[in-house]
From Swiss-Prot:
Protein's UniProt name: Nucleoid-associated protein PD_1058
Disulfide bonds: none
Keyword Manganese: no
GO cellular component: bacterial nucleoid; cytosol
Gene Ontology MF terms: DNA binding
Keywords attached to this entry: Cytoplasm, DNA-binding
Amino acid sequence: MRGNIAQLMQQAQKMQENLQRAQEELAKLEVTGSAGGSMVSVILSGTKECRKVRIDPSILNDQEMIEDLIAAAFNDASNKVDAESKERMGSATLGMSLPPGFKLPF
């Protein structure tokens, strides 16, 4: 019984170290989302901080289109960050299953 608890504690410590490393990697990550055939692109960090917005000069006179494309590009980038985060955090949990709805990072 003690061996099982010690092993579980070692696994938990290893998982915590892996999660910390994955969070640090995500903070450095940059993901690009685009919309309108790349007329608008948004670069987000792995923590969903907006780093840059690029707008093709050919659409600068169409405010409504710009607004729609920025929102779509942001959502595209956000979905990519979520997918990357899920993948990295999943491998950081050492295959341990987490309860449904349990989000990482904490």
